Amino acid sequence: MVVNSSKDPQNKGMTPRKEIDQEMVSWAKKNLKNTPGNENYEKMVSGVPYNPYDPDLMFRALATSEKVREFNTIASESRTFESNHAAYIKKVEILKDTFGQTKDIVWLTAPFSVDFGFNISVGEHFYANFNVCFLDSAPIIFGDEVIVGPNTTFVTATHPISPEKRARRIVYALPIKVGNNVWIGANVTVLPGVTIGDGSTIAAGAVVREDVPPRTVVGGVPARILKHIPEEDPDEAEGEELEFLLPVEMNVNTANQKV
């Protein structure tokens, strides 16, 4: 899916759309669960100014905050593998109930925070470390095999730079898309409308405000391309590959077999 970031080529900033993005609305209805079915939601995911204080949105945000609070406070009842695994499974159930779309294997290290949850889509083997924040007024779409470092923030909601327009409480949101096999380092901020290409790496501390090409390393404030990543011949790769499982993938039989 190609995400329309609604970027202004003149100032490399963001501008709100004036019309509903039917492609995005159709994608959201088809792929995301528990989304509002009203016009305000269609504006929100389209980059059109919307009402963030819509009663339905506020109710859903409150319900999501309760789920996230439960996730962040679940603890193992005892120091046994079975008890730990039960806690992992419960957390994954909460994640799958909170996010709009998930694959089988998804894991976040508590705590994390999110606005709504229903606008988040994560691929297979998604992992995020401590204190990741998802401001998902517009969709945040992750591919497979994505790793997110601690204290990283994904921001889709934004405001006009004009103080007069901000005084009128104008707010709109632009989607973020992260491709497959992407590593996002610690303390990164990804801004509205950004697409991060497959196989790329975002260096720690970067502020990403423009699209990232596939197989590149970007870093800095604002982020810029530091290097291009050449394709590697699997037969010539150096070092021994270490195979391991995420906690939710493990069971009693695999616990002592995998590192």
UniProtKB/Swiss-Prot annotation:
Keyword Chaperone: no
The enzyme's E.C. designation: 2.3.1.-
Residue(s) at site: Transition state stabilizer: N129
Free-text disruption phenotype from the record: Produces purely unacetylated sophorolipids. Yields mainly lactonic SLs, in addition to minor amounts of acidic SLs.
Keywords of this entry: Acyltransferase, Repeat, Transferase
Induction: Induced in early stationary phase (at protein level).
Binding site for acetyl-CoA: N129, A186, A204, R209, E210, R224, K227
Active site per the UniProt annotation: H159
GO molecular function: acetyltransferase activity; O-acyltransferase activity
Region (Disordered) residue spans: 1-20
Superkingdom of origin organism: Eukaryota
PROSITE patterns xrefs: HEXAPEP_TRANSFERASES
UniProt cross-references to Pfam families, sorted A to Z: Hexapep, Mac
PANTHER family reported in the protein's UniProt record: ACETYLTRANSFERASE C18B11.09C-RELATED, SIALIC ACID SYNTHASE-RELATED
Family: Belongs to the transferase hexapeptide repeat family.
Function of the protein: Catalyzes the optional acetylation of acidic sophorolipids (SLs) at the 6' and/or 6'' carbon atom of the sophorose head group to produce acetylated acidic SLs in sophorolipid biosynthesis. Has no activity toward lactonic sophorolipids, confirmimg that acetylation must precede lactonization.
Protein name per UniProt: Sophorolipid acetyltransferase
Organism per entry: Starmerella bombicola
This protein's encoding gene: at
